[in-house]
């Protein structure tokens, strides 16, 4: 091209008369280079090349519309040349002049929405010509800017969505197998070392111990005792939250940390959470504000987690190197999320990781052929990632642990603060960074997702029991305008929004059904050795979801596999499943999920916790009422056995609740013909029937004894309130005491009387 451009401030015009069939790749390069040389101050080469590329594409469409093949070909060459020069800008910043010095930063800003966006086809053309060895240098500014966006405490779901969108665009445009590999080369995608990064130079351990000892000595403690306690306090100071480095220094951890909506914690007092719940406390002032705030926050959390899950899925699908690094990082998070003082990530991080694992499992859930790829054995627990995610001390379903009767001594107190667990954690973490054995991807996803569900959703669902009515009790004491009451309302919104996403609930239900089918495929020996939480989660998660959101059960699919699992595990009495907690969860699942509402009655605990009314699933009710003779033959004796064995299953304080549930099951099954026939054959199992009869008599005796103890208290309160005459001096004293009592004391006496009457 000769002469000056028509408009130096605009992109050159390409017409048929100017081209005349002589425009080739070389001349196109000269044209584009001339435009870059005449770039104004502040203009960036990457943006200029993108404008040229877009204009050439528009001109190519115009030429195609008028069937000008020569012009269309020439313009295509010019556009491709612009994309090729863009790759030069990214590989060698400054190679095309001053305007190309910040091209990598411009690319990162454009992907994050801080600058004019770049078309995917332009990015694909530019990044395709960058070698895999240099692609990681091009990706580094992008990852750095993503981390800077998320590190402030004010980061929101909008920032997460923007970062995930930028990284997903990179994965789509930078090429299969190489895009993810370039990202994970960055230190923000690596598993950090076990030791916590310190903010400054720490004092030597001995000097710090001496500081503690000196303070205790000043308080009057003996020298040797002060030294011992100083060492112990130093151990407490070293016991840091091992999940925090993954949340504060790693990009995936930063994303997951913000994904939970409002920030709440389980291990700190509610008063200390005011900062994280401040926004919700301003929004939610009364119970009627909770539904709308919950819907809004749930939608935000859902969009945020879907974006993170999409990013993790993109990393896993991009290539083997990216997939292995991502799985190892997520496994390290599981390793550091197990309950205990050494490793406990925040609820938002654990729930976000759980949603990501469920997203990875989504393609095979419900597909019988694909689910069969999850090997029906416990061999994966012996692999490197399996050992890192699953502690060696997990309780098995065939184990019935007995509480220790040994008295606590000083050594046991010291064990609470030593750092012996660091060695175990470090060894497991090292395993999580080694290449895994050759297990099918479905097998790996199933086992690791099962652990993520236990540490994430299952752990958090437990905290939702009775949470709806805690603010009402607080308001009765301090009023609705008190910060504590408003913080409780905000916590209700935060917890339900973090757990109540429709997509996550659907994935959880599908995954629980998959767990049931996998457990049914296990041999008896493997089922006995199976970690207890796998069986418990398959039973409790649908129940807890029904408790938190009663509509969940009504709109869910029937659960024939769960019914078969209950019949198999309970039908063998205690020979297959000895764990008392697992047996109690199996019976509770039958009561919560398979009984009609008319057959249920609230237990003592449910009445005390103001539990929402349970719903029913018509499909499940039909499954139980018309069960096969094989299931009925196993289930009926097992339920009688559970009733009589209630003292030995579950929590000792829940014996009455367990028997109420089992009694409702027995009553309902007796009305079904197939189960009544099974009950009539119970005489063949003398041991189960005797256990049931003993349990029935024991429970009756216990209730009668409790009623006899409470009758005098009920009579005394009736005398206090004037329902009965005060016929002697003792009764007159009780009435005078009640009449002279203040309102608080009267409420206490009335409440105790209501509890006694409720017991009767």
Where are the predicted features?
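Extended alpha-helical scaffold domains
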Residues: 2-760
């Amino acid at each position: 091209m000769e002469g000056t451009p028509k408009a130096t401030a605009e992109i050159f015009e390409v017409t048929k008369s100017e081209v005349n069939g002589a425009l080739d790749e070389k001349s196109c390069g000269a044209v584009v280079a001339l435009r870059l040389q005449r770039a104004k101050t502040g203009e960036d080469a990457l943006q200029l090349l993108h404008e040229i590329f877009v204009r050439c594409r528009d001109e190519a469409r115009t030429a195609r519309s008028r069937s000008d093949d020569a012009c269309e070909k020439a313009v295509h060459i010019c556009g491709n040349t612009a994309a090729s020069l863009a790759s030069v800008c990214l590989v060698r910043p400054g190679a095309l002049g001053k305007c190309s010095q910040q091209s990598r930063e411009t690319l990162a800003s454009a992907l994050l929405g801080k600058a004019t966006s770049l078309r995917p086809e332009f990015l694909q053309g530019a990044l395709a010509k960058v070698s895999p060895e240099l692609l990681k240098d091009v990706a580094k500014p992008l990852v750095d800017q993503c981390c800077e966006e998320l590190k402030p405490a004010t980061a929101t779901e909008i920032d997460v969505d923007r970062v995930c969108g930028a990284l997903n665009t990179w994965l789509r445009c930078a090429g299969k197998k190489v895009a993810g590999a370039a990202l994970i080369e960055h230190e923000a995608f690596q598993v950090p070392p076990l030791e916590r990064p310190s903010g400054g130079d720490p004092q030597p351990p001995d000097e710090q111990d001496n500081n503690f000892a000196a303070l205790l000595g000043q308080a009057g403690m003996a020298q040797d005792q002060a030294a011992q306690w100083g060492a112990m306090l130093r151990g407490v100071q070293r016991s840091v939250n091992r999940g925090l480095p993954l949340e504060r220094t790693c990009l995936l951890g930063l994303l997951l940390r913000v994904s939970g909506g409002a920030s709440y914690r389980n291990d700190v007092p509610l008063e200390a959470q005011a900062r994280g719940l401040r926004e919700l406390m301003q929004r939610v002032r009364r119970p009627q504000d909770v539904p709308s705030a919950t819907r809004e926050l749930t939608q935000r959390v859902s969009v945020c987690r879907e974006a993170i899950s999409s990013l993790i899925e993109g990393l896993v699908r991009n290539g083997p190197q990216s997939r292995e690094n991502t799985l190892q990082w997520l496994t390290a998070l599981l390793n550091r999320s197990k309950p205990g003082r050494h490793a406990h990530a925040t609820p938002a991080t654990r729930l976000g990781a759980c949603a990501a694992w469920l997203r990875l499992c989504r393609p095979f859930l419900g597909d019988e052929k694909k689910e069969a790829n999850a090997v029906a054995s416990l061999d994966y627990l012996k692999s490197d990632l399996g050992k890192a995610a699953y502690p060696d001390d997990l309780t098995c379903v065939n184990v019935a642990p007995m509480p220790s009767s040994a008295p606590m001594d000083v050594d046991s107190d010291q064990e609470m603060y030593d750092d012996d667990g660091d060695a175990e954690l470090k060894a497991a973490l090292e395993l999580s960074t080694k290449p895994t054995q050759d297990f099918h991807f479905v097998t790996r996803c199933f086992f690791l997702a099962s652990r993520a569900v236990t540490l994430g959703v299952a752990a958090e669902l437990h905290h939702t029991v009775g949470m709806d009515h805690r603010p009402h009790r607080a308001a009765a004491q301090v009023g609705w305008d008190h910060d504590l009451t408003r913080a409780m309302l905000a916590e209700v919104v935060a917890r339900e929004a973090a757990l109540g996403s429709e997509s996550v609930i659907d994935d959880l239900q599908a995954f629980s059904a998959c767990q049931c089918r996998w457990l049914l495929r296990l041999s008896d020996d493997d089922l006995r050795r199976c970690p207890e939480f796998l069986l418990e989660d398959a039973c409790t998660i649908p129940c807890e979801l029904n408790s938190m959101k009663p509509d969940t059960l009504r709109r869910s699919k029937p659960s024939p596999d769960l019914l078969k699992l209950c019949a198999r595990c309970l039908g063998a009495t205690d020979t297959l499943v000895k764990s008392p907690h697992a047996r109690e969860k199996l019976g509770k699942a039958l009561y919560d999920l398979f009984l009609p509402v008319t057959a249920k009655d609230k237990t003592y605990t449910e009445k005390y916790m103001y539990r929402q009314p349970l719903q029913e699933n018509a499909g499940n009710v039909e499954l139980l009422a018309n069960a096969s003779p094989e299931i009925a033959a196993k289930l009926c004796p097992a339920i009688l056995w559970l009733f009589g064995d209630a003292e030995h299953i579950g929590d000792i304080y829940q014996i009455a609740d367990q028997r109420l549930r089992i009694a409702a099951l027995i009553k309902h099954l007796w009305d079904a013909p197939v189960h009544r026939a099974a009950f009539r054959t119970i005489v063949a199992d003398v041991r189960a029937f005797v256990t049931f009869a003993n349990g029935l008599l024991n429970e009756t005796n216990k209730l009668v004894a409790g009623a006899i103890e409470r009758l005098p208290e009920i009579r005394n309160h009736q005398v206090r309130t004037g329902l009965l005459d005060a016929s002697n001096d003792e009764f007159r004293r009780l009435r005078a005491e009640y009449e002279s009592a203040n309102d608080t004391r009267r409420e206490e006496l009335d409440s105790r009387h209501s509890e006694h009457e409720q017991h009767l």
